[in-house]
């Protein structure tokens, strides 16, 4: 609630760094990114929420409990491998300019996860109205195709060889 966020680089005589010019437009759109990055204005928590830089605002005293509750919900309800692949896709798709290729990656990941034990467990748990018991782990059960550097965001010759 008392957080403040700003990309103040231009107010210090330098350009935005840490991939701000790449990340911020993807989060808030080009018009808002331009406003934020070219003015260097500092936003309060409510403004950051309105701009889409944060997903929610909580009172300062509730920040750690809210973060833990979100982490617990993900850990309790979501299949770990599915979460890991989703995170990989969220970041990877941001670099992908070819919509048809992105759709292929999406379909491949959906098909693969749908054939795994956690998919069967997720459906079973839902039908039986009980918490899921996930058996797969990101440390040991990730699909091999995620290691292919040509999969998302690659450019040039490596991409053409698909």
Which residues does each predicted region cover?
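Generic hydrophobic alpha-helical segments
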Residues: 33, 71, 86, 109-110, ...
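C-terminal long alpha-helix characteristic of the crotonase
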Residues: 1-3, 54-101, 117, 133-157
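Short, flexible turn/loop "capping" segments at secondary-structure junctions
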Residues: 46, 102-104
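Crotonase-fold acyl-CoA enzyme core
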Residues: 1-81, 116, 120, 130
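An acidic, glycine-rich surface segment that forms the CoA-thioester-binding/catalytic face
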Residues: 11, 18-22, 27, 104, ...
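Helix-loop "lid/cap" segments that line or gate small-molecule binding pockets
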Residues: 36-37, 89-93, 108-114
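Catalytic Tyr-x(3-8)-Lys segment
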Residues: 52-53, 106-110
């Amino acid at each position: 609630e008392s957080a403040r966020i700003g990309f103040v680089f231009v107010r210090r005589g330098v350009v935005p760094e840490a991939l701000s010019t790449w990340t911020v437009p993807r989060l808030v759109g080009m018009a808002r990114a331009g406003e934020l990055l070219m003015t260097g204005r500092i936003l309060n928590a409510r403004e950051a929420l309105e701009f889409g830089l944060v997903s929610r605002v909580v009172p300062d005293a509730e920040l750690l409990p809210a973060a833990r509750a979100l982490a617990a919900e993900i850990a309790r309800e979501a299949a770990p491998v599915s979460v890991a692949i989703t995170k990989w896709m969220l970041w990877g798709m941001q670099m992908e300019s070819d919509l048809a290729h992105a759709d292929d990656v999406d379909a491949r990941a959906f098909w693969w996860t749908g054939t795994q034990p956690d998919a069967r467990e997720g459906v079973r748990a839902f039908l039986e109205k009980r918490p899921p018991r996930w058996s797969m782990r990101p440390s040991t059960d990730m699909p091999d195709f995620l290691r292919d550097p040509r999969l998302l965001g690659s450019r040039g010759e490596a991409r053409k060889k698909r």
